[in-house]
Every structure is written in C-alpha cells, then in structure tokens.
UniProtKB/Swiss-Prot annotation:
It catalyses: UDP-N-acetyl-alpha-D-mannosaminouronate + N-acetyl-alpha-D-glucosaminyl-di-trans,octa-cis-undecaprenyl diphosphate = beta-D-ManNAcA-(1->4)-alpha-D-GlcNAc-di-trans,octa-cis-undecaprenyl diphosphate + UDP + H(+). This is UDP-N-acetyl-D-mannosaminuronic acid transferase. Catalyzes the synthesis of Und-PP-GlcNAc-ManNAcA (Lipid II), the second lipid-linked intermediate involved in enterobacterial common antigen (ECA) synthesis. Belongs to the glycosyltransferase 26 family. The gene is wecG. Keywords: Glycosyltransferase, Transferase. Pathway: Bacterial outer membrane biogenesis; enterobacterial common antigen biosynthesis. It is an enzyme of class 2 (transferase). One of its GO terms (biological process) is enterobacterial common antigen biosynthetic process. InterPro entries: UDP-ManNAcA_Trfase_WecG, WecG_TagA_CpsF. One of its GO terms (molecular function) is lipopolysaccharide N-acetylmannosaminouronosyltransferase activity. Its EC number is 2.4.1.180.
C-alpha cells in the first residue's frame, strides 16, 4: 500500500489533527485506493482553535468531524513544536477544495455546492464546469430559511452527490454538514468558508509569496484593517504556543 494513503495524527489542546506532508499526500489520503473517503473535512487555524476552546457546542461539532487538518500556519508551527519529528505542512482549504474539484471533474464524481451569494454561486458553477468539467448535480445559495433545510437535505440525498461543499462560515457550515449527514451520510463533506468568493475573483487572495512565508494573515489585515480585533484575539493563541501549553 502506498504510504500516502495513511497519515499520522497529532493532538493540540485535545483536538486531533491529521498530519499531511503536502497537498499530494492529502489527495492520496482522501482518494485511497481509488475510493473517495466519506466524512467531514474541517480546516483548523488559530482562530478556530480559540472558538473551539470557548464554545462547547462548536468543540463537539468539530471533534466529531473525521478529517481535521492544519489550514493555518500557526497550527502547523504548533504541531512541529509539540512533535519535533512531525512531517506536517499547511494545506490551505481553498487550495484543497480546488484540487478536489479538479479531481472530481477528471473522475466524474458528482458534486453538490451549498452557500454563497446567488450570483457568486452561479459563477462558481460555471467556472467549475468550464475549467474542470465538474459534474455538478445540484446547488443552493446560502439564502434559504431554516424551515427549508430538511427539503435541502433531501435534495442533496436525491442528487447522489459524493462531494458536498458548504460555504456558510463557521460554525454554521459545520452545523449544516452534521445535520445533512443524518440524511445523506455517503459523501465527503467540506466546509469552505469564503472559498467561492476567492475562486470567482470577488475576494483577492494573498500573493503566493505571502502564503509561502506564512504571512497570509498579515496581507488580509493590511487589505482589511477592520480585522484588527480578530487578529488581536489571536494573541491568546500565541501565548499557548510560546508557553508550550499545547
């Protein structure tokens, strides 16, 4: 068996994370032996670690997800500090989603898209079909009423989707995925936040060099100064990291 179909796990503050070496490792793991895994993918960054710490419901939701991976460079550095021999790298959720969509297009895997503004969702569908010939079997923008959720779950189930990506922000998307899986368990679910906006060019992502240097957070802060309160909140995570309270 190819070693890439397996992955070690690491624990940070009680949360178990999958340790992928790189993007190829992540893809080989999720498509082990040609079969797409079923379960829920959740990207973990420092901000989400803080939310998990402070919100018991979110912690329970995320703990229940099968595939929690290091999306933030701070989390990667913490894993490396706690486990010096760990061969783990950041796998950005936006990049993983694109790679999954490209693979789905190649293999004809049925995909259902949830979330985003109606116009952004429509552009996402069109681009996915044009770029990778993705087999999109259904979609629903993020503007639906609570009483419409059950009917949406039934639509997703009837579509036969094997990948369901949900762009509703955390923890709404995690709650949605948990509840939808009760109706349609046989799929890989992925919470993708604002990925559709980035994919369609409505939101500009940090240049590659900033990403490589682990400074994507700084680029976002410079682009959106209103994020300063969110960034200051992360000082608590830095304290955990530098005091070894991991």
């Amino acid at each position: 068996m190819n070693n890439n179909t397996m992955a070690p796990t690491y624990t940070l503050r009680g949360l178990q994370l999958i340790g992928w070496r790189d993007m190829q490792h992540a893809l080989d793991y999720l498509f082990a032996d040609g079969h797409l895994k079923q379960g829920t993918l959740v990207a973990i960054n420092a901000e989400k670690m803080l939310t998990i710490e402070d919100n018991a419901e979110v912690r329970e939701l995320i703990n229940a997800a099968e595939f929690k991976y290091a999306d933030g460079i701070s989390v990667v550095r913490s894993v490396r500090k706690k486990y010096p021999q760990a061969q783990v790298s950041r796998v950005a959720g936006a990049d993983l989603w694109e790679e999954l969509m490209a693979r789905a297009g190649k293999e004809g895997t049925p995909v259902f898209l949830v979330g985003g503004k109606p116009e952004v969702l429509a552009q996402t569908e069109a681009k996915l079909r044009n770029q990778w010939n993705v087999n999109i079997v259904g979609s629903q923008d993020g503007y639906f009423k609570p009483e419409q959720r059950q009917a949406l779950f039934e639509r997703i189930h009837a579509s036969g989707a094997q990948i369901v990506t949900v762009a509703m922000g955390s923890p709404k998307q995690e709650i949605f995925m948990r509840d939808c899986r009760l109706v349609h368990p046989d799929a890989l679910y992925m919470g993708v936040g604002g990925t559709y906006d980035v994919f369609t060019g409505h939101v500009k992502r940090a240049p590659k060099i900033w990403q490589t240097l682990g400074l994507e957070w700084l680029y976002r802060l410079l682009s959106q100064p209103s994020r300063i309160k969110r960034q200051l909140r992360l000082l608590r995570y830095l304290r955990w990291h530098y005091t070894g309270n991991l």
